[in-house]
Amino acid sequence: MLKDDMLEVALLGKTIGLKGAIKLHNRSDFPSQFKKGAKFYLTDGEILEILSFNKTNFVAVFKNYENIECAAKLTNKILYQSKEITKKTCKLGKDEFFYFEILGLEVFENEEKLGKVADIFEAGNFVFEIATDEKLIKKGFPKIFYLPYTDHFIDKISIEEGKIFSRFGFEILQNS
């Protein structure tokens, strides 16, 4: 299993009942991906297929784990999904992006590279943590700064170019 291509989507919790049901602790923004027939991966590369899923309680039964003894072996394991399958099964709206598409993008303002997106936080609106470009750090700017993901500060996101074009990002950096 290629770790770079995989996304953590759920933590498997405790078993429920005698027939192998297990609680899923969702770690994704797309709970609709959990349904009968969906396949996921464990860290060791094993593929788990959902035989039944209760979306109200977030409880699943996996193929070949249909009893409590087998299902108990899955407790505290992490479910993964590939980025490719995620793109196919989890639909986004206009001007929406997956986190994995945004992380690592370079941030530019007026053709000057400000840095790269290191993390994304949800604080009311989304906020990008930017790791400042080395050239700017050498000039005395902070190593990180935060850029709100709003139309006021983000002019354009181009996944194809690997860039985010900002407005007023440099002012935020100067005042950080």
Curated annotation (Swiss-Prot):
One function term, GO molecular function aspect: ribosome binding
GO cellular component terms listed in the entry, alphabetical order: cytoplasm; ribosome
GO BP annotation list: ribosomal small subunit biogenesis; rRNA processing
Stretches assigned to the PRC barrel domain: 94-176
Domain of life: Bacteria
Keywords: Chaperone, Cytoplasm, Ribosome biogenesis, rRNA processing
Subcellular locations according to the entry: Cytoplasm
Primary location class: cytoplasm
Domain remark from Swiss-Prot or TrEMBL: The PRC barrel domain binds ribosomal protein uS19.
Subunit structure as annotated in this protein's UniProt entry: Binds ribosomal protein uS19.
Record-linked PANTHER family: RIBOSOME MATURATION FACTOR RIMM
The protein's role, per its UniProt record: An accessory protein needed during the final step in the assembly of 30S ribosomal subunit, possibly for assembly of the head region. Essential for efficient processing of 16S rRNA. May be needed both before and after RbfA during the maturation of 16S rRNA. It has affinity for free ribosomal 30S subunits but not for 70S ribosomes.
UniProt similarity note: Belongs to the RimM family.
Protein name as annotated: Ribosome maturation factor RimM
Organism: Campylobacter hominis (strain ATCC BAA-381 / DSM 21671 / CCUG 45161 / LMG 19568 / NCTC 13146 / CH001A)
Gene that specifies this protein: rimM
